[in-house]
Amino acid sequence: MPRLILASTSAYRRQLLSRLQLEFDTGRPEVDEQPQSGEAPSALASRLAAEKAAAVAVRLPGAWVIGSDQVADLDGQALGKPGTRAQAQAQLTAMSGRTVRFHTAVSLIGPERELHALDLTEVQLRALTPAEIERYLDAEPALDCAGSFKCEGLGISLFDAIRSQDPTALVGLPLIALARLLREAGFHLP
């Protein structure tokens, strides 16, 4: 079996990939995550997933490298990871009662081959009061998550609905698409 590398230091992505029961290592991708001028959120996610995989693949010839990225999209504007509580409050306030699109891209780069996929998840947030936003951030300050919430935790209470073909995509790694790409690359999965 060829060597498999996850180009990420994200604990969320490591946990998800471990569900496929394949042995893998991780590598830290060094890429500039700034959007290019006029770049759509879906294109940004796709480009960053490919760049992350390529940045690690160049150091490990012969390995298959998985890169993934997620971009939250509110009315065509990319929302980054908040980083601060104030920014998380602003994001959650802006998303309150609205639909947010999450573009989650995955790239698999190996010897002389690249495979790519993109998943779209739509999250309908319920109307949130300022007090609810404060209580949520007190309980689960999701400052390292696109959209300022963790759907796998208490963040699910902020939603009215989720629409997606792959429920793992919202956590940051679309396993249905990735399993397909891995099978195409010759990995043995059920």
Swiss-Prot record:
It catalyses: N(7)-methyl-GTP + H2O = N(7)-methyl-GMP + diphosphate + H(+). InterPro entries: ITPase-like_fam (IPR029001), Maf-like (IPR003697). GO terms for cellular component: cytoplasm. Keywords: Cytoplasm, Hydrolase, Nucleotide metabolism. One of its GO terms (biological process) is nucleotide metabolic process. Its cofactor is a divalent metal cation. One of its GO terms (molecular function) is nucleoside triphosphate diphosphatase activity. The keyword ATP-binding does not apply. Nucleoside triphosphate pyrophosphatase that hydrolyzes 7-methyl-GTP (m(7)GTP). May have a dual role in cell division arrest and in preventing the incorporation of modified nucleotides into cellular nucleic acids. Belongs to the Maf family. YceF subfamily. This is 7-methyl-GTP pyrophosphatase.
